[in-house]
Amino acid sequence: MVAALAGVSRATVSRVVNSSPKVTPQIAEVVNNAIAQLNYVPNRAARSLASRRTQAIALVVPESTAKLFTDPYLASVIQGIALALADTEYTLNMLISSDTRAEKTRRYLLGGNVDGALVVSHHSGDQSFGHLGQSLPVVFGGRPLLPGESSSYFVDVDNAAGAAGATAHILSTGRRQIATIAGPQDMPPGVDRLNGWRRTLAMHGLDQSLVEYGDFTPLSGAAAMRRLLDRGRPIDGLFVANDQMAAGAYSVIYERGLTIPGDIAVAGFDDNYFGATSTPPLTTVHQPSHELGAMMAEILMALIEGKPAPRVTLLPTTLLVRASTG
């Protein structure tokens, strides 16, 4: 009735009710006048009963709160999700699910509390979430690792290609003893970025044994760099699986009296403030994390509404060359 009185579509009324910035002030005034005239009050509960939808979407983050609130990648993805949902009627419920709470989270998701779920930072051990797609619409941020998840919907970047490009760039500077600090091997980015590094070195017939692992934090990057240097083998290039670990590696390189890029050319992955504020600024692989989050939300809304959506969406990366590689 509001739409008819205001002479606009129901979608426009919905945007006005949800304070969407896409509605002009003039249209908003007309709709608000109609709402006042009809004494209309949006009733989410009634709409949920009629449509059998909750108008709620769960954002599941299988990480500790410490990592969630310090990781710029997760922050960017979540921001992309939130902005994509801002002009819709969906509310976003964030569920921070540690190992001990995974089953509780799964029960909540399957209890009719949400219309769908977005899962970011997925680990292969998170089996409680691996088969959710059989019961409700789910979109993962990152390709699944478990065989049972092969039919899942996911959005990812081409991690292997990005890592391969960064490694090839280090090679182009004349470096040949190229090490890597890889990410967790129970996460798709950790696996794929390591494979990209290996693939590039294999193409040039170079040694692939200079590998240490971290958990995407600066402290783990520093520890991995110490282990690499303690081997006593020459290293003149380093690809690090994310910028946070690269920042940790920087500190150890300087601690040992070495220079960047004079002694070791360094490249990272992510393109966040850790790399941009390093000295020298870090060559890194830019991944469109904000766009990734937005795409996850768009695909999930399409699935909820019964519209066709791609199962696999792979976004490109871009190499940003800075002073850390010469």
Which functions belong to the PLM regions below?
Residues M1-Q55, G326:
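N-terminal helix-turn-helix DNA-binding module of bacterial transcription factors
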Residues T12, R52-K67, H169, Q177-P184:
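Short beta-strand segments enriched in small/hydrophobic residues
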Residues I27, T70-Y73, G130-H131, G190-R193, ...:
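Residues at alpha-helix caps and immediate loop-helix transition turns in enzyme cores, especially N-
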Residues Q37, L83-T88, S135-F140, L145-G326:
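Bacterial carbohydrate/catabolite-sensing allosteric modules
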Residues R44, I96, S121, Y213, ...:
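Short loop/edge segments at beta-strand edges and connector loops
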Residues A45, K104-R106, Q127-S128, S220, ...:
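Short acidic active-site motifs
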Residues A56-V60, S64-A168, D230, P234:
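Alpha-helical recognition/docking segments in bacterial nutrient-uptake
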